[in-house]
Curated annotation (Swiss-Prot):
This is Glutamate-1-semialdehyde 2,1-aminomutase. It is an enzyme of class 5 (isomerase). PANTHER family: GLUTAMATE-1-SEMIALDEHYDE 2,1-AMINOMUTASE, GLUTAMATE-1-SEMIALDEHYDE 2,1-AMINOMUTASE 1, CHLOROPLASTIC-RELATED. PROSITE patterns: AA_TRANSFER_CLASS_3. The modification N6-(pyridoxal phosphate)lysine is found at residue 269. The keyword Cytoplasm applies. It catalyses: (S)-4-amino-5-oxopentanoate = 5-aminolevulinate.
Length: 431
């Protein structure tokens, strides 16, 4: 068991000045218990905490570090920009054109793109744009899909898909809730009912084509195709939220992997290479409604700043030129098969979902295809599993409902270590 004396001291101090002691709730370890770990350094596939403990990192800053932490090409590019160019100007820069052009080349849906500072900004802006473009107010989202902390997304359906949304967080107005409708993931009929009951009122349907904040739940291809067809028929803007799965499950994201093209796409995480960046883009006809060429307002003081764009641009170039995806698939499949073998040896049959290098081991025997099936997990068992893995130097997300990210810099030795730790941790979970 790692000694966390310094982390515990820092957490107590942090709680005096920061709500809950953290700047994002999942970091507080409420789901798994114990002391939140304060990190001091990251290098490659590993992190070291303030107490000197080292961990193999399967969180990867919640997704961005597909190439590992402190990648030499990325850090060198950042250093060059920092020392020779600057951090921000609040003016157009040539690098904005370069990354925009690259995105149009690698993401199927993108004809024009606007850079922002976070995934939440991207999704909020995309929904506003869809409303402006269609002249409609309501949106459909899916239970269990996370689109950031914008008011429109913090809505959960009531007892059924036809009920009006109720705010899922204080501070979200009833008016906002009324304009957000929830459908069931992977269930096209639940969507059709909402569209029929709100004829000509739906501006957008927004979906994570690979849901990553209810564990990992892939959309079924026929479900996504049915959404695409329905949106085309009804004049609804289809938005793929690829903040997490974009550039992760394929270079062109889930839309490349599935072969289904949305009208708008939101991006984040990997596109920033570890620095705060988001983007939204799509059809030229829709994007031309964005100010200043159009009437849908969107702006940002630090949008397109050279430091963040440098990290993102270098990351995308490496992914394009080096094509780590076949090797990422091999590594993630090795873990999946190793975990399955371990469960077979122990007489367990928990569910694993995986798309490319993002995966989740669910502590349930029920196939996980949506929010309702995801919440059948045994959270106490996950907590015991988590702490056993942590004790063995494996850092996973401190929540059952998050993804496990494999990075390109993980070695076969790292993977074998993880499979061995999993065997021990599964037994700890059952104890």
């Amino acid at each position: 068991m790692p000694q966390l004396t310094r982390s515990a001291e820092l957490f107590e101090k942090a709680k005096q000045f920061i709500p809950g002691g953290v700047n994002s709730p999942v970091r507080a370890f409420k789901s798994v218990g114990g002391t939140p770990i304060f990190m001091a350094k990251g290098q490659g596939a590993y992190m070291t905490d303030v107490d000197g403990n080292t961990y193999l990192d399967y969180v990867g800053s919640w997704g961005p570090f597909i190439l590992g932490s402190m990648h030499p090409r990325i850090t060198a590019a950042i250093e060059n920009t920092l020392t020779k160019i600057g951090t921000s100007f609040g003016t157009p820069i040539e690098m904005e054109i370069e990354i925009a052009e690259l995105l149009t080349q690698i993401v199927p849906s993108i004809e024009m793109v606007r850079m922002v500072n976070s995934g939440t900004e991207a999704t909020m802006s995309a929904v506003r744009l869809a409303r402006g473009y269609t002249g409609r107010d309501k949106i459909i989202k899916f239970e269990g899909c996370y689109h950031g902390h914008g008011d429109s997304f913090l809505i959960k359906a009531g007892s059924g898909a036809l009920t009006l949304g109720a705010p899922d967080s204080p501070g979200v107005t009833k008016g906002t809730a009324n304009d957000t409708l929830n459908a069931k993931y992977n269930d096209i009929e639940s969507v059709r009912v909402l569209v029929k009951e709100n004829k000509d009122s739906i501006a957008a349907i927004i979906i994570e084509p690979v849901a990553g904040n209810t564990g990992v739940i892939p959309a079924k291809t026929d479900f996504l195709q049915a959404l695409r067809d329905l949106c085309t028929e009804e004049g609804i803007v289809l938005i793929f939220d690829e903040v997490m799965c974009g550039f992760r499950v394929a270079l062109g994201g889930a839309q490349e992997r599935y072969g289904i093209t949305p009208d708008l796409t939101t991006m984040g995480k990997i596109i920033g290479g570890g620095l705060p960046v988001g983007a939204f883009g799509g059809k030229r006809e829709i994007m031309q409604r964005v100010a200043p060429i159009g009437d849908v307002y969107q702006a940002g003081t630090l949008s397109g700043n050279p430091l963040a764009l440098t990290a993102g641009l270098e990351t995308l170039k490496i992914l394009r030129d080096d094509n780590p995806y076949p090797e990422l698939e091999r590594k993630a499949a090795f873990l999946e098969e190793g975990f399955r073998d371990n469960m077979n040896k122990l007489g367990l049959s928990y569910v694993q979902n995986r798309v490319g290098s993002m995966a989740c081991l669910f502590f349930t025997e029920t196939p996980v295809e949506n929010y309702d099936t995801a919440i059948t997990c045994d959270l106490k068992k996950y907590g015991k599993y988590y702490h056993s893995m942590l004790d063995q130097g494996i850092y996973l997300a401190p929540s059952q409902f998050e993804a496990m990210f494999t990075s390109a810099v993980m070695t076969d030795e790292d993977l074998e270590k993880t499979v061995k730790a999993n065997y021990v941790a599964l037994q700890a979970a059952e104890a």
